[in-house]
């Protein structure tokens, strides 16, 4: 029989083990960030006017990449964003008002968004926190049944620089999405498009092929990582209902007007080389009763123009790989 001091030592050692693991993980992540390439070292500059035209299927001029963001906001944390500031401007937990604003999207707004895409025969990409598959399986299943693409968007919505073990979080996200859909996700979007210096190395290491965090182009381009190239697919920060409706406080038709103007420009310019127009929406914003008619009108406007296709991220990735291989 073990003596009391031995038992106490064993308990102390067991208690210290998680802290030691966390310390090693933090040290490794800090080292990875120090050794990682800077963002501006991961790609070569390329002026779009200097590039040879990319081959596209006959009749295609403009690729539209629609993205719907489905997130898990934990009521025990500060909210990822606020529509209404608490009295006195102090952040509070639980922030019931802003949490409820987001939850409206999961209970009401998402069903309007799903119906609008169904009516226009468009299957978007869904940027999804993996935990949604566990806490809101009704939403995730409806998207899966509608043929939406699942793009990994971390496990739960929180700043990426606060994640203690990014590798583990990325693996967890992949495992949950694969278990729910039966397919391994190929695309990644960071929360708030956030990254630490080493994030893209972790993403490539986990087997992802493409990501949407960088907004600096209207065509895909390769980004270098320690584990081979990742394809950056341009995901617009300007055509996003957060920036338009929440940050800039536009009227309910603000996204329709901006999207129509952007679409017309890219559709005209695409005569000289294919362009990608992307837009991002959130169910608690675009799915609101006073905005859904304008969201639907935006889809209708794009749908009726000639030479336009609506593609998911993996389709864009595969097309670009084939197009650049043929042009090599």
Language-model segments: residues:
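Short amphipathic, positively biased membrane-proximal segments
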Residues: 1-25
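Catalytic alpha-helical scaffold of carbohydrate-active enzymes acting on polysaccharides/glycoconjugates
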Residues: 24-232, 256-279, 285-328
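A conserved mid-domain beta-alpha-beta active-site/ligand-binding segment of alpha/beta enzyme cores
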Residues: 234-265
